[in-house]
Amino acid sequence: AKWNEALGRIRVEGGTEEERTIFYTALYHSLLHPNIVSDVNGEYPAMESGATGVAAGYDRYTVFSLWDTYRNVHQLLTLVYPEVQTDMIRSMVAMSQEWGWLPRWELYGRETFTMEGDPAIPVIVDSYLKGLRDFDINAAYEAMKRSATTEGKHNAIRPDIDPYIERGYIPVGIFAQDMSGDNSVSHALEYCSADYA
């Protein structure tokens, strides 16, 4: 019944039965993750601590593959499932309060540091601009500001931020310390996208 309600929020007309099946299968896939991690009593694994937190009045979410989802999935959730997106924003803000940083690619209370950039910022800002405001806006702003202004040696999400702030770009080799696997351009583009938000 819950899946029918979730999938039924979008009604598709026209197309073939096969095309409608493809659409609803894709919609189903977009709703799998992030997923609720809090138990029925609200308990969840707190971010980066091994402690147990309690989500009061909201569902705590996990599996924030934000680099993969900040450009598309969260906009869908904001428009069609705003109550779910609001709980996801609350979860991200709570994570920043628990360990100091918004998540990039969080998995069951741990930051994996997988992928690039600072993708929680555009997700939160987009949700706010579309009218979702039932979260701690001041805490969200402080977390975003901390990420965008803290020097690299103390910045878990943007360790190569110093040249970006000083020069507007990140030189080759700053992050990787050599030319293998250098991500300087992608880091600068992702930081710029987050800062523009």
Please name every model-derived segment.
Residues 1-60, 94, 101-104, 133-153:
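Acidic/polar, glycine-enriched structural segments that form the non-catalytic walls/loops
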Residues 7-16, 60-62, 73-78, 110-111, ...:
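Second-shell loop/turn segments in exported
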Residues 13, 59-63, 73-75, 79-86, ...:
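A conserved hydrophobic secondary-structure block that centers on an alpha-helix together
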Residues 17, 50-51, 63-66, 114-115, ...:
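Short helix-capping and inter-helix turn/linker motifs at the boundaries of alpha-helical repeat units
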Residues 23-38, 62-85, 125-131, 195-196:
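Alpha-helical support elements that line or immediately flank enzyme active sites
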Residues 87, 91-197:
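Active-site cavity-forming subdomains of large catalytic enzyme subunits
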